[in-house]
């Protein structure tokens, strides 16, 4: 590879070097929110070339060798990503029969051996006669997870009781994934499957490009993402009918209507605060999707029983302990500084007394 090629900045590499929140606004069909960022990166590329130009020939030669080593490393890393993808695909196929069996047990398609032999009193026996599978399995599993619990409103719970299964798969371009939520017939919406698809810029270092959700076909008066407000007319008003207003409300089902980046024509209307808020919303949306994919689907029963939540709590405690240790170190340093100051003051006082 020649030095001129090395110094060239390729904008196609943009996605591989940005954090998820920022890159959420930097794919090719996204709006001009990213143009400023690209300009900054191009300026940085220019600075990179300037730095190389300032090096002495001897140092430049050493840096060139280091860059060759980096190229070798990147090639090995590329092979690693390929092998990892193949390994993940292999085990995903091995998981499928287990997920199918889980679906059958949860939804009462098959019965577990020994269930009818379990001792029960008469009341329990009557209830068990009408009870199939594991009621509210997915609702309970999701509510046990801290991230998802914040998204599920009390109104959502009735609808989520009809959730039969959640699956995920990679999409065709292998730069993203799709979540599928399978619902039993219910009084809230007519869709049997709700999907959420995440398109990524780079599969190896996930960077969100855009997200697309299913349009939910709500039954009349059952939309959970909106609430109807009735306002009484003013006294003496000719129109005696109450004013009816529809307002968007918090709901898990807003997950299927993800935040969208505005079109190019609307670029001038977006200020810095709005752009930052949009970034945060897209990052939060991706966190929810990846939590369902990486935690809920593979470990659903552990979330249902609460065991997985306990494991998460231990991780949080360890993180908090690390933060506390850092704070303690800072406190110790402050105390040492204070001791040094007191000692210095004492020395000055002693010197003053001797002079007198």
From Swiss-Prot:
From the record, which residues define motif Nuclear localization signal? 230-235
Q: Please give an example of a GO cellular component term from this record.
A: cytoplasm
A Gene Ontology MF term for this entry? chromatin binding
Q: Where is the composition biased (Acidic residues)?
A: 309-343
Q: Where is this region: Disordered?
A: 304-356
Q: Where in the cell is it found?
A: Nucleus; Cytoplasm
Q: Please provide the record's free-text comment about the domains of this protein.
A: The acidic domain is probably involved in the interaction with histones.
Purpose: May modulate chromatin structure by regulation of nucleosome assembly/disassembly. Could function together with B-type cyclins in the regulation of microtubule dynamics.
Listed under subunit, the entry gives: Can form homomeric and heteromeric protein complexes with NAP1;3. Binds histones H2A and H2B in vivo. Also able to bind histones H1 and H4 in vitro. Interacts with CYCB1;1 and with alpha tubulin.
Which family does the similarity line name?
Belongs to the nucleosome assembly protein (NAP) family.
- This protein is called Nucleosome assembly protein 1;4
Give the species. Answer: Nicotiana tabacum (Common tobacco)
Gene name linked to the record: NAP1;4
């Amino acid at each position: 590879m020649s030095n001129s090629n090395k110094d060239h900045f390729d904008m196609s590499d943009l996605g591989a070097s940005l954090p998820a929140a920022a890159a959420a606004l930097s794919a090719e069909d996204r709006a001009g929110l990213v143009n400023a960022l690209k300009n900054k990166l191009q300026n940085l590329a220019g600075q990179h070339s300037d730095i190389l130009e300032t090096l002495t020939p001897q140092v430049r030669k050493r840096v060139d060798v280091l860059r060759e080593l980096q190229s070798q490393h990147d090639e090995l890393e590329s092979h690693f990503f390929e092998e990892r993808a193949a390994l993940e695909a292999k085990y995903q196929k091995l998981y499928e029969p287990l997920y199918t069996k889980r679906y059958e047990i949860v939804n009462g398609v098959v019965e577990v051996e020994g269930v009818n032999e379990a001792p029960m009193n008469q009341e329990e026996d009557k209830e068990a006669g009408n009870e199939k599978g594991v009621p509210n399995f997915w609702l309970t599993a999701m509510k046990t997870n801290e991230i998802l619990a914040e998204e599920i409103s009390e109104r959502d719970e009735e609808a989520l009781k009809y959730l039969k299964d959640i699956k995920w798969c990679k999409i065709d371009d292998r730069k993203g994934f799709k979540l599928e939520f399978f619902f039993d017939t219910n009084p809230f919406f007519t869709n049997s499957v709700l999907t959420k698809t995440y398109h990524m810029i780079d599969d190896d270092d996930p960077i969100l490009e855009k997200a697309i959700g299913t349009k939910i076909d709500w039954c009349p008066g059952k939309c959970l993402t909106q609430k109807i407000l009735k306002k009484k007319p003013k006294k003496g008003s000719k129109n005696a009918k109450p004013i009816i207003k529809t307002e968007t409300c918090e709901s898990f089902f807003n997950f299927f209507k993800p935040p969208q980046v505005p079109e190019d024509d609307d670029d001038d209307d977006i200020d810095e605060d709005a752009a930052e808020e949009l970034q945060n919303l897209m990052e939060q949306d991706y966190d929810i999707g990846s939590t369902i994919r990486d935690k809920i689907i593979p470990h659903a029963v552990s979330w249902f029983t609460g065991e997985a939540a306990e494991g998460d709590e231990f991780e949080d405690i360890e993180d908090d302990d690390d933060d506390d240790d850092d704070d303690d170190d800072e406190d110790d340093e402050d105390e040492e500084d204070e001791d040094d100051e007191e000692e210095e003051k004492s020395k000055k006082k002693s010197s003053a007394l001797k002079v007198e």
